[in-house]
Structures are given as structure tokens and as C-alpha cells.
């Protein structure tokens, strides 16, 4: 918050603006925006993507627009190649559940599978994405998102590129601003250490006994 001091790269800075960037629809990649000023007048921006340690999703609402922004003009090819790589696993899935199975309710009918980007392989319908380093950086930073998400609002003020993250913080507990600085990593450094992004396909089921489903969701694989 305003007035908080912290040490960064050998200097002491005082926060002059801080908040969560927001946009009219959807979300930018930055979760924490900080503008700070040093004693000698130098201003810096710190834009952090923040995740809990058990959070595995990177993008969990992947629609056509978002996929193109994150994966580029060949987004369809990336998704098709990814899902085809586990075709046999889709073929082995039940489509109609007369009885409850694991987390799937009795009477469910699978309509298809949603596509999510995650930071670790998880579940049976999951695999590694074939992406360049630039594409991986775009997924984490949001540097290819539209202007209304890149130039987000912080405390009511539109700030250029406030929605594009430069750092990542993965922690369940931070005690102070200095604690945040000590635990955050530059995105390019983090990606050097964690170069892989994975996909996970989650079923969209129609629950016949309740006559309900999870709403209209884009499907990477449909029945």
C-alpha cells in the first residue's frame, strides 16, 4: 500500500501506487501492480503474477479469442496436435455414466472436453504442449493480450502495460513487502527453470437427473 518501503536491487523504495489491475471483461495477467520511488527519485514498476503453491492452472477458461492471444495465429494447430497426442485416452473414456464414477454424477453424459493450460501434468487427459520460449513467455506474461487487458485500471487509473506481468510469485504466505521481493522471480528466469507448459482436458457433462450442465463452454474435443 501507499507509503510502504522495501529494498530492491540495493535501493530502498517507497510505494506511491499499488493495487490489483482490472479490466472491463476477463482478467489481465498481473495480480499485483506496484509503482515505487527511491530516495534519489528513480521510479520503478513491479508487476507480479501471483499464484498459490497448489495452483496448477495457468489458463482455465480457454476460448478462441484467448487461445489466439496466448498461442498465436497457429493456436488451432497447437490444440489439435495436443489433443491428438492423447487420442487413445479419449477413446477409452466412458461417455454415459449410469452410476456415479469418481467425481462424475450418476446419469451424466459427456458432451466434450474443455482445454486448460497448466504448469504440471495432471489427470489422465493431459500432456505437454509443443511451444517456443516466446510462446511460453506470452502465456505467463500476457504480452500478446488485447490493449484493454494490457492497459488495465489500477485504483481507477488506466496504466499502460499494467496488466503485463514481469515477475511471478508462488507462495502461500508473505509477511511483508520485502518478503514479496525476496520470493518473486523475473518471469524470464522462472521460464528458464520451468520451460514446459502442459494441457489438461476437463469433461463438460450434462447431468440428466438434475437437467443441468456447467453452461456454454468452448470445447477442444466434442462428442
What kind of region is each of these model predictions?
Residues 1-223:
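Short, positively charged
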Amino acid at each position: 500500500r501507499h507509503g510502504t518501503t522495501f529494498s530492491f536491487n540495493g535501493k530502498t523504495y517507497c510505494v506511491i501506487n499499488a493495487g490489483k489491475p482490472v479490466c472491463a471483461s476477463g482478467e489481465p495477467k498481473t495480480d499485483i501492480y506496484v509503482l515505487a520511488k527511491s530516495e534519489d527519485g528513480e521510479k520503478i514498476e513491479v508487476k507480479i503474477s501471483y499464484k498459490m503453491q497448489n495452483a496448477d492452472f495457468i489458463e482455465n477458461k480457454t476460448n478462441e479469442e484467448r487461445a489466439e492471444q496466448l498461442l498465436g495465429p497457429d493456436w488451432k494447430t497447437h490444440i489439435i496436435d495436443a489433443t491428438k497426442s492423447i487420442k487413445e485416452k479419449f477413446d477409452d473414456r466412458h461417455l454415459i455414466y449410469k452410476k456415479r464414477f469418481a467425481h462424475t454424477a450418476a446419469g451424466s453424459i459427456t458432451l466434450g472436453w474443455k482445454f486448460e493450460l497448466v504448469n504440471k501434468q495432471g489427470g489422465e487427459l493431459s500432456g505437454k504442449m509443443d511451444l517456443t520460449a516466446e510462446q511460453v513467455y506470452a502465456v505467463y506474461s500476457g504480452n500478446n493480450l488485447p490493449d484493454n487487458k494490457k492497459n488495465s485500471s489500477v485504483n481507477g487509473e488506466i496504466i499502460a502495460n499494467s496488466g503485463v506481468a514481469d515477475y511471478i510469485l508462488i507462495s502461500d504466505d508473505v509477511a511483508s513487502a520485502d518478503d514479496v521481493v525476496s520470493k518473486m522471480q523475473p518471469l524470464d528466469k522462472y521460464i528458464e527453470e520451468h520451460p514446459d507448459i502442459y494441457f489438461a482436458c476437463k469433461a463438460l457433462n450434462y447431468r440428466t437427473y438434475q437437467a443441468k450442465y456447467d453452461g456454454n463452454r468452448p470445447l477442444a474435443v466434442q462428442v
